[in-house]
Amino acid sequence: ILEARARESLDEVLVIASALSVQDVRDRPMDMQAQADQAHAKFDDDRSEFSGYLTLWKWINDAKGGEGTHKLSNRQYEQLLRQNFVNIRRVREWRDIYSQLHTVVAEHKWRLNAAPASYEQIHLSMLSGLLGNIGWKTEGDEVAQTEYLGARGIKFHRHPGAHLRKKPGRWIVCAELVETTRLFGRGIANIEPQWLEEVGAHLLRKQLLDPHWEKKAAEVVALERATLYGLVVYSGRRVGFDKVDPQAAREMFIRQALVAGDLLPEMHKRLPFLAANEKLIAKVESLEHKSRRQDVLVDEELIYAFYDQQVQPELCNGRSFENWYRAAAQARPELLKLTRDELMRPEAAGIHTSAFQLSPIPIPAPTTTLSHQSA
């Protein structure tokens, strides 16, 4: 009811709450079940038994008639209720509970909503007090078609007497869970899983999986999974990892974007130091190849340390980094450009390109041989 006040659905929720406080007013005698079901069908809703209560309440109040219509006597009215298999005594109980709730609302000076509430407003209000009675339909064999996985691992079935025109949806909420031959859900209504995020945000348990670098977005992204009482509300939702663990996101950003250069071509062009550094690294790698040594170029950890020392601590994605670099490079054009000395190990300092230039090969002068005739 408190939630309904905030969501402007107080009028409807008072009717539903009072209906759930008494025994169902619809009679279903053993010897007249088919006739009762036929009479009750006009109250049924496609998606929600809660909505069915509202239809039934309106019919009960309109059936007697009033201004502008022929008003039935009490006897005629009670006869009409019996013909439609509506229990008179329970209707009175329902009205009594409704009146009591209405009085409490009036004492608090809460106003009933003037405009009819939407399906979402009504069911969000109801859901706030029934989060432990949600269910998710499993898929599989024929039995699973009526079976729902509930909170904390329980399994239940929709009640066979549910007043719905259509089969319940994938996600439902129940007014109550009743165990007879097996566990059944009564008072069923279809809900949307995103409503659970809104109403049950304080109960969601979230887990981040697979933090990874996304080249197109130029940021570190993780996949979020949220559960409510063990039920997976959503999974695989992309979340910016910098909002969760900025330090880890920054490290991954530097390694992937700056050290490895894993950026889209257009962003790569806007960061000229990358091309300059890659060109210089290629030259040092060429020296390694010519010298047949593997200890000329420093390892990636030292290149990472170079960037880590100069990049601001709060920068952990492509957008924020590019904005910072554009401003900082105006004052320091050589910002983030590596030098040859920074890329070569100290023990390889003596190696340079001139050491591998080819020296000219001397050609011996021709010798003259004298013949015997000349002699």
Predicted regions and their residues:
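Long, contiguous regulatory modules within eukaryotic nuclear regulatory proteins
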Residues: G132-D141, D341-P360
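Second RecA-like catalytic domain
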Residues: I1-V220, Q247, E251, L274-Q310
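Accessory interdomain/linker segments of ATP-dependent helicases and helicase-like nucleic-acid enzymes
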Residues: W94-R111, E322-L335, T339-D341
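Residue-level detector of conserved catalytic or cofactor/ligand-binding positions
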Residues: I361-T369, Q373-S374
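Basic, amphipathic N-terminal segments
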Residues: L209, W213-Y325, R332, L336-D341, ...
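Short amphipathic alpha-helical segments with coiled-coil-like heptad repeat character
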Residues: G161-L164, A260-M267, S371-Q373
